């Protein structure tokens, strides 16, 4: 079984390669790691592979899928939860097996969201830089106590639930908005409509998937309904936020702070070193000049535990496909490695 991994970083090689070596899979897996992202220009590098492993910024449009199919690839494995970058209907038509890693260490993302909140709130990033320059003045570093504040969680899935469990420990009141409420979350907070959440919360944290109904869920209209001076945190998907809208809200002081681990235009920038380049994304560069904005490079998931779970689940998905065993992680069941057609589109 030959697997080609696109957009491979050193940590992908360490975790995927290490776990593949140590696990007993049948048939044995031969992995080819490529640092280049998958696109129409690089799809030919998968020639001879049974499967490809891709990441959130790889391109899997109809043209790329057809090139992969012509190269002999029959399975596509996402080593992430998001799959907005693939044409699933074309993948189904061609008979691909497609699977993702739906959840990995939700606590990692929730913990990072809280870290962003406290960095922004208590201004530890500014204090760190001051002290390095010998400046121990506290002016401009005033924060607020989280205890007693109201935190709104948009999306109460596994990450949203983990967020609720952590924030409850600070003594915060919790509100949530989700079209699909869960009994598990009701132990920690109250479900309300989005307008109520925005108007009452001191902190709003986004933990919902990106789809048509959530694209730019934060926009001119919804920002105008937020409590004045509230903090907005996004560790989910960049497309949830209309960046122009939050920029205006920051300038008018409607928003008191913004913490982003994801960004709508991140594909051209994130996971790469641009320290020696001129960055042409004027919107992002403008955001980073605000004293009340913190931006990180999509690292909320980035823990040892999460990388282990991702590697194990990715290889388990491959093993299930190779053995013709249905997997709950399939986005498209396609054909198994023996060419037998399984049921079509699993979910969209």
Swiss-Prot record:
Keywords associated with the record: Antibiotic biosynthesis, NAD, Oxidoreductase
Residues at the active site: 237, 266, 298
E.C. numbers: 1.1.1.-
The keyword Membrane belongs to this UniProt entry's keyword annotation: no
Family annotation (Pfam families): 2-Hacid_dh, 2-Hacid_dh_C
Induction: Expression is positively regulated by the KK-1 cluster-specific transcription factor kk1F.
Binding site for NAD(+): 158-159, 178, 208-209, 235-237, 261
Biological processes, Gene Ontology terms: antibiotic biosynthetic process
Knockout mutant characteristics: Abolishes completely the production of KK-1.
Keyword field contains Oxidoreductase: yes
One Gene Ontology molecular-function label: D-lactate dehydrogenase activity
Stored CDD domains: LDH_like_2
Known role: D-lactate dehydrogenase; part of the gene cluster that mediates the biosynthesis of KK-1, a novel cyclic depsipeptide with 10 residues which is a promising active compound with high activity against many plant pathogens, especially Botrytis cinerea. Within the pathway, kk1H catalyzes in the synthesis of D-lactic acid from pyruvic acid, which is recognized by the A domain of the first kk1B module.
Record-stated family: Belongs to the D-isomer specific 2-hydroxyacid dehydrogenase family.
Protein name as catalogued: D-lactate dehydrogenase kk1H
Origin species: Curvularia clavata
Name of the encoding gene: kk1H
């Amino acid at each position: 079984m030959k697997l080609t991994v696109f957009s491979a970083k050193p940590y992908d090689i360490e975790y995927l390669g290490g776990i593949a070596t140590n696990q007993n899979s049948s048939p044995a897996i031969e992995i080819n790691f490529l640092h280049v992202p998958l696109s129409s220009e690089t799809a030919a590098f998968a020639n001879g592979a049974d499967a490809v492993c891709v990441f959130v910024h790889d391109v899997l449009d109809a043209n790329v899928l057809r090139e992969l199919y012509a190269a002999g690839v029959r399975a596509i494995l996402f080593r992430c939860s998001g799959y907005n970058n693939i044409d699933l209907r074309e993948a189904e038509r061609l008979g691909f097996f497609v699977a993702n890693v739906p959840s990995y260490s939700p606590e990692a993302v929730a913990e990072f969201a809280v870290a962003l909140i406290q960095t922004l709130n208590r201004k530890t990033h500014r204090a760190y830089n001051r002290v390095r320059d010998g400046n121990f003045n506290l002016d401009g570093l005033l924060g607020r106590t989280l205890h007693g504040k109201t935190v709104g969680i948009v999306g109460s899935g596994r990450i949203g639930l983990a967020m609720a469990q952590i924030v409850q420990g600070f003594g915060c009141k919790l509100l949530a908005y989700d079209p699909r409420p869960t009994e598990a979350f009701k132990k920690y907070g109250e479900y309300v409509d989005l307008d109520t959440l925005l108007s009452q919360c001191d902190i709003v944290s986004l933990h919902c998937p990106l789809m048509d109904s959530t694209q730019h869920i934060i926009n001119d209209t919804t920002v105008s309904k937020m409590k004045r001076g509230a903090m907005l945190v996004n560790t989910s998907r960049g497309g949830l936020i209309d960046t122009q809208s939050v920029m205006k809200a920051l300038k008018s002081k409607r928003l008191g702070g913004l913490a982003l681990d994801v960004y709508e235009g991140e594909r051209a920038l994130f996971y790469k070193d641009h320290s020696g380049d001129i960055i042409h994304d004027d919107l992002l560069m403008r955001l980073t000049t605000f004293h009340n904005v913190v931006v990180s490079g999509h690292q909320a998931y980035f823990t040892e535990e999460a990388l282990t779970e991702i590697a194990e689940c990715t290889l388990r998905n491959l093993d299930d496909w190779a053995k013709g065993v249905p997997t709950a992680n399939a986005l498209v069941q396609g054909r198994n490695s023996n060419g037998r057609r399984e049921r079509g589109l699993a979910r969209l």
